[in-house]
Amino acid sequence: MAKDKDVRPIIKLKSTAGTGFTYVTRKNRRNNPDRLVMKKYDPVVRKHVDFREER
């Protein structure tokens, strides 16, 4: 019912290195309305790379 317009939805963060590796996290839509970008570890390339929010 109200799951679609949740304030803190579950999002996928996909690696920009092109490996297809993803993290799953939650974000607050009120504080961060734009797409989230985080620097996290990608075990496929064994480096820290940018992970972008996938829609």
Curated annotation (Swiss-Prot):
Keywords (A to Z) from UniProt: Ribonucleoprotein, Ribosomal protein
GO biological process: translation
Keyword Cell membrane attached: no
Record-level GO cellular component terms: cytosolic large ribosomal subunit
Gene3D superfamilies, sorted: Ribosomal protein L33
Protein family: Belongs to the bacterial ribosomal protein bL33 family.
HAMAP family to which the protein is assigned, alphabetical: Ribosomal_bL33
Protein name from the UniProt record: Large ribosomal subunit protein bL33
Organism: Kocuria rhizophila (strain ATCC 9341 / DSM 348 / NBRC 103217 / DC2201)
